[in-house]
């Protein structure tokens, strides 16, 4: 339900359905529940994604990797860039994200020739909804400086688990683990 002044209720109806039609006709086609669930959960999911990005930045910077933005910088979105400077670390990190995923955790992402890219790309995203990078995903082109673009984390607990597994895979064979 939406409650408040009638002019604000009308504006909300216009925003949630169809401009000019408002609450009376809007093209919801039986998806009101899903639309409202999205509005309800969005603040929590975005907060979890931001916390996951900040934690990623802090942990990877502590391990000696360059990150953008840094954990203590102002953020404009939920994407965390991790600069690995070598393809092996980029691949291992993305594979670790996939291993911690709720869907297809047994899949092993490998670099491939993706249409539209001049370099091979590795993509990790074991998501409930295909293509939903907000759940937790990590990808990057295999070219210098080998940047991983990580985003998402439906819950902060899941985001932390993903980072822990990715760092574990990243550090295999290195003395710092």
Model-derived regions: residue spans:
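Conserved C-terminal alpha-helix-loop-beta "cap" of PLP-dependent enzymes
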Residues: 69-70, 76-176
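Active-site C-terminal subdomain of aminotransferase-like
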Residues: 2-89, 162, 170-177
